[in-house]
A protein has these predicted regions:
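AlphaC helix of the eukaryotic protein kinase fold
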Residues: 3-20
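Short beta-strand micro-motifs within the conserved protein kinase catalytic domain, predominantly
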Residues: 28-39
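AlphaC helix of the protein kinase catalytic domain
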Residues: 50-60
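Activation segment signature within eukaryotic-like protein kinase domains
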Residues: 67-68
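Catalytic-loop of the protein kinase fold
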Residues: 79-95
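Conserved activation segment of eukaryotic-like protein kinases, specifically the C-terminal portion
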Residues: 121-137
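Conserved catalytic-loop aspartate of Hanks-type protein kinases
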Residues: 149
Length: 202
């Protein structure tokens, strides 16, 4: 029974946090019932996830650049709401029929707002997220932060295998071993990413 109750609480938090993040690059929640015997929510049906497209080499360079911009916009909005996603990876980026890519899966989101829900639903010492996208400090039980999401975004950009020398320094700065050497915010990542292409076009 305790496990069922924990699942219900986690599910509720996931839906509430995701519904708070209304943005064109975040999967929207249209309707939900969090108090039903079997809680549920309704969202758009995605065509596929980014991991599938990367694995099957389905993306052009222009598409990859556009996807990075959309992911950065979505994650920046999550952070602006005072949340940490904590599970950014290609599998959690979904493509929809209009060609838009949206960040999904708020199951591990943490609310950092002072008045936020501080209930711990995961045992102390349990590491969350996927190992490849997990910042090094998390392996030593450090606190999650904006910079742990920055690290994960850097790994996601790396996965897209953009054959462009301008991108490598951005990936390197996102994924520094020491978090203090990484970008301070997702907006900083976006600024360098966008301007690296503007400089090349001028």
């Amino acid at each position: 029974m305790a496990q069922i109750e924990q699942f219900r609480r986690r599910f509720k938090r996931e839906v509430v946090y995701q519904s708070h993040c209304v943005h064109s690059n975040i999967v929207p929640i249209y309707l939900c019932d969090l108090f039903a015997e079997n809680p549920w929510f309704i969202m758009d049906k995605a065509e596929c996830d980014l991991e599938h497209e990367i694995t099957n080499n389905l993306l052009t360079t222009d598409q990859k650049i556009s996807i990075v911009k959309m992911v950065l916009d979505g994650v920046a909005h999550i952070h602006a709401k005072g949340y940490l996603h904590r599970d950014i990876k290609p599998f959690n980026v979904l493509r929809f029929s209009d060609g838009t890519y949206k960040v999904s899966d708020f199951g591990l989101v943490k609310d950092t707002n002072p008045e936020g829900d501080t209930t711990k639903l995961t045992e102390i010492g349990t590491r969350m997220g996927s190992t490849r996208y997990m910042a090094p400090e998390i392996l030593y039980n450090a606190e999650y932060s904006v910079k742990t999401d920055v690290y994960a975004v850097g790994r996601l950009i790396e996965d897209l295998n953009l054959d462009d020398k301008k991108i490598k320094p951005i990936i390197a700065k996102c994924t520094r071993m020491d978090k203090d050497d990484r970008y301070q915010t997702i907006d900083d990542v976006a600024f360098d990413f966008v301007h690296s292409f503007l400089r090349s076009e001028s």
